[in-house]
Structures are given as structure tokens and as C-alpha cells.
Amino acid sequence: MQALLAPVVEALGYECWGIEFLSQGRHSLLRVYIDHADGILIDDCEKVSRQISGVLDVEDPISSEYTLEVSSPGMDRPLFTLEQFVRCAGEQVKIRLRSPFEGRRNFQGLLRGVEDQDVVVLVDDHEYLLPIDLIDKANIIPRFD
């Protein structure tokens, strides 16, 4: 899906921050996160949604019913790629793993960066190197200071 939709988003002048496909029984949700240095407004989401809808209608990559949602990543932005983990180093993060690592699946702490294919997180004075392929979900924890 990334290979199909990212070029559409980028051709409009936005960054394709990430794509989620959430299966919810017979109806699913395709969520496309877009970003821009000047921020994202509802008009930006509408413009990108129209273009993506056209591509999806032609290519028809999803056989079931779904809803398309185009959104800003927001303050609690999800992290999808190693590059995003590098860009967000120094932020507080919440990470959920697909399976336990060192006896736990949930980590909340300071994102230190990336080493090879591992995301480095400091939790309670202990540094964890979490393999990127084990990460199910990761989000920035917004600061309000």
C-alpha cells in the first residue's frame, strides 16, 4: 500500500508519514497520515483524500469494504520507520511489541535513537534495544510544557 499511495501524497507536496490498515470485521479502515513543514489543515486532508480515492478506485487493491481516512500524525504521532525513530530521538515514547522482549511487551521512556535495526529506549535507567520488526505500535507522548 505504501508503494501505491506514497507517490500520490508526495506529488501533492506532502510527506506520507505512514499508512495503517485496520481490519474491523466486515468493514476496515485505511488510514493515511500526511505531514508538511507548515502543518496540516483539513483542506490538505481533503485534497489528498480525493487523489488517493481516485487511485484506489482504479487500482482496487482492497477487496473488502473500507473507509479511507487521511489525517495529520498529530501530537502523539505514530512512528513507523527507523528514520522516524531517528528524527524523533529525545522524545518520550510508548511502544507495544508483537511478542514479549526481555519479559515485557510494553515500554514507555526516552527514545534514544537507533542502532542497526534496533530502536533504543531508556526506561527507568535501563536501556533497551528493541528490534524494529517486533514493534507493533509506537507513539510519541506529547509534552505540554
From Swiss-Prot:
InterPro entries for this protein: Ribosome_maturation_RimP (IPR003728), RimP_C (IPR028998), RimP_C_sf (IPR036847), RimP_N (IPR028989), RimP_N_sf (IPR035956)
GO biological process per UniProt: ribosomal small subunit assembly; translation
Domain of life of the native organism: Bacteria
Keyword DNA-binding set for record: no
Entry-linked CDD domains: YlxS_C
Keyword vocabulary terms for this entry: Cytoplasm, Ribosome biogenesis
Entry's Gene Ontology cellular component terms: cytosol
Subcellular location: Cytoplasm
Family: Belongs to the RimP family.
Purpose: Required for maturation of 30S ribosomal subunits.
Identification of the protein by name: Ribosome maturation factor RimP
Organism of origin: Azotobacter vinelandii (strain DJ / ATCC BAA-1303)
Gene: rimP
